[in-house]
C-alpha cells in the first residue's frame, strides 16, 4: 500500500514525458479557426481523436512534441506560435454582432473572429510602446425594447457626445478610432466574402472591436456599416446577437446618426427626384438607397414612389451611380506600428516578442492601415 503513491507519480511522469511544457491552448484555438478547420478535421491531420484536440484547446492536456509538429504543419503556423507568448484575448461568438449571421457559415465567422482576436493582441502589444486613444464611448440608457423615437434620440445624443453637433459626420471610421475603438478591415484573400461587417463591445481586452468587409469598396456603404456597428456597440452590450430586431435597431441608429431627421427631413424630395437625391448623397456621404429608404421612412415618399425608386436602384445595381470615392479606411493600428518602428522596435522585433509569424503580423497591421498613397521626397 505504501508504494501506491510512488507508482502513481511515476505513471504520471511517464504520461507527461515528451509533452510540450510551454504549450498555449488559446493559440491552438486561434490558429485552428484562422485555418477554417474543425476539430475533427485537425484530428484527422494529426492522427488523434477529436476529443484529444478538444482537451488540447481547453488546457486539459498538452500535445506531445510529435503532435505539435503535426499541428504546426496542418495549420501553417510555426511551432513557436503555439508556445506561451503574447496573450490573445478572446471574443466570444455570442457577443459578436454579424450583419450576415444567417448567410455565413459558422466556421467562416469563427475565422473572422480569430483575426479580430489577433488584431486586439497586436494592438495590446503596440500599446506597450505608444499611447493609444482610450475608450471614450458614451453610455446610452435605453429601455429593453426601445421605440424608434428612443433610438433616434440615442443617435442624436451619441453625435453630441462624440463631438458631432450638426451636419454630416466627416469621417465615421476615424471618429470611432478617436474614441478608442479598434477598427480593422478583413483581408480580401483567404476570408469568405459573405462575412460582412461585425462588432463586439465585450472583448477580453476591454477595447471595442469593429471589423469591416473588404468587399464594400464604396465610401457611402462603408460609412453606413461603421455607423451600424457603432449602434451595436452603444445599444447592445449584453444583448444576444443575431436577431432581426437587434439588426433593425442598429440600422435605425445608423440612419439617424448619419442623416438626422431634424436636419434632413425638409430637404428630402416628395417624389423620385434623382438630381436632389444625388445632391444629398454628396452632402451627407450616404448612398442613394439609404436616402430613398430614409425618405420613405420619414413619410416624404409615398409607397408607390418608394417602389419606383427601388426598382430603378435594382436596375442600376452596385456600384450605384455617383460614387463618392474609396471606402473610409482605419489608420490607428498602422500609424501606431509606424511609431513603434520609428522608436527602434521594428515589426520583426515585435513578431519575435509576441511569437507571431512576421507575415501574420504584417497582415494584421495592414488591416488597420490606410492604403492611401504617401508622398515621399528623396534626394
Description of each model-found segment:
Residues 1-379:
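Active-site hotspot residues in diverse enzymes, especially metal/ion-binding acidic/histidine motifs
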Amino acid at each position: 500500500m505504501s508504494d501506491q503513491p510512488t507508482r502513481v507519480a511515476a505513471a504520471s511522469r511517464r504520461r507527461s514525458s515528451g509533452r510540450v511544457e510551454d504549450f498555449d491552448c488559446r493559440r491552438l484555438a486561434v490558429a485552428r479557426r484562422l485555418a477554417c478547420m474543425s476539430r475533427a478535421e485537425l484530428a484527422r491531420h494529426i492522427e488523434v481523436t477529436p476529443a484529444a484536440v478538444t482537451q488540447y484547446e481547453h488546457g486539459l492536456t498538452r500535445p506531445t512534441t510529435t503532435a505539435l509538429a503535426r499541428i504546426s504543419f496542418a495549420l501553417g503556423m510555426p511551432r513557436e506560435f503555439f508556445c506561451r507568448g503574447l496573450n490573445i484575448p478572446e471574443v466570444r461568438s455570442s457577443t459578436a454582432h454579424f450583419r450576415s449571421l444567417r448567410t455565413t457559415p459558422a466556421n467562416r465567422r469563427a475565422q473572422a473572429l480569430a483575426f479580430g482576436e489577433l488584431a486586439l493582441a497586436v494592438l495590446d502589444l503596440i500599446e506597450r510602446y505608444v499611447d493609444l486613444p482610450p475608450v471614450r464611448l458614451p453610455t446610452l440608457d435605453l429601455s429593453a425594447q426601445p421605440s424608434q423615437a428612443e433610438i433616434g434620440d440615442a443617435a442624436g445624443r451619441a453625435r453630441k457626445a462624440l463631438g458631432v453637433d450638426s451636419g454630416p459626420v466627416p469621417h465615421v471610421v476615424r471618429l470611432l478610432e478617436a474614441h478608442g475603438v479598434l477598427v480593422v478591415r478583413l483581408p480580401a484573400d483567404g476570408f469568405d466574402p459573405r462575412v460582412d461587417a461585425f462588432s463586439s463591445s465585450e472583448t477580453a481586452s476591454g477595447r471595442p472591436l469593429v471589423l469591416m468587409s473588404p468587399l464594400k469598396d464604396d465610401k457611402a456603404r462603408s460609412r453606413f456599416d461603421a455607423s451600424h456597428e457603432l449602434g451595436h456597440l452603444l445599444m447592445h452590450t449584453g444583448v444576444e446577437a443575431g436577431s432581426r430586431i437587434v439588426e433593425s435597431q442598429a440600422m435605425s441608429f445608423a440612419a439617424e446618426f448619419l442623416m438626422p431627421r431634424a436636419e434632413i427631413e425638409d430637404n428630402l424630395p416628395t417624389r423620385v427626384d434623382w438630381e436632389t437625391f444625388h445632391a444629398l448623397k454628396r452632402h451627407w456621404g450616404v448612398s442613394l438607397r439609404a436616402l430613398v429608404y430614409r425618405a420613405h421612412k420619414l413619410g416624404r415618399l409615398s409607397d408607390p414612389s418608394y417602389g419606383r425608386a427601388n426598382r430603378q436602384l435594382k436596375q442600376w445595381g452596385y456600384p450605384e451611380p455617383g460614387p463618392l470615392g474609396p471606402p473610409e479606411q482605419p489608420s490607428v493600428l498602422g500609424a501606431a506600428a509606424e511609431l513603434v518602428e520609428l522608436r527602434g522596435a521594428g515589426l520583426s522585433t515585435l513578431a519575435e516578442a509576441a511569437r507571431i509569424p512576421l507575415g501574420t503580423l504584417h497582415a494584421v497591421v495592414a488591416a488597420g492601415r490606410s492604403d492611401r498613397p504617401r508622398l515621399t521626397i528623396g534626394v
